[in-house]
Amino acid sequence: MARTPDLRRRQQLLDDLIDEFAAGGIGDRSLRDVAAAVGTSHRMLLHHFASRDEMLLAIVEEVERRQMAVLSKLPTDPAESFAAMWATLCRPELRPFERLFFECYSRGAQGEEPFARMVPGAVDAWLAEAAKVGGPDNDPALVRLGLAVTRGLLLDLVATDDDAGVSSAVQLFADLLRRPGWK
């Protein structure tokens, strides 16, 4: 009879894998290389994640889950919510994780598996969570625009490290959200 994976050990491996991939990207690294980097064996990774693809999806889902956790703590005003979300996401210590997200997202947009399976959820899950938090007055188009602007500015930031330029664009978008007719 097969043993149920130890969930604490799986979570610890997942945390270690996220840190490893955030530091060095995913690339085409083999399961053996990844296992060695996090101090385990490829068999243990397979035991906990079943396959390389499932391991990669678990990594993406966990990073997204961590980022979405902040939504319930945001103000309901769109401009204030955007500014607070940005203040959370733009922290320098999160940039490796943002780079990891964009690596996975771009590979998924090209149709590469398993990343292609994550792209719809990377949009739909955020929109659904924002709708729950914002309530019935949330404009779905405005929520989608906010997500697109946030991701575009994050991509700009992680690619250029131009904090000042991106911060100016963030402030401009927040100011636009404060104008009459944007809520």
PLM regions with names:
Residues 112-123, 133-183:
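Hydrophobic/aromatic-rich alpha-helical bundle segments in the mid-to-C-terminal region
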Residues 1-8, 181-183:
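N-terminal intrinsically disordered/low-complexity leader segments
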Residues 61-67:
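Short, basic, alpha-helical segments at the C-terminal edge of helix-turn-helix-like DNA-binding modules
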Residues 92-120:
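Amphipathic alpha-helical segments used for helix-helix packing
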Residues 12, 16-23, 69-73, 100, ...:
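Solvent-exposed, amphipathic alpha-helical segments
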Residues 12, 16-54, 58:
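Helix-turn-helix
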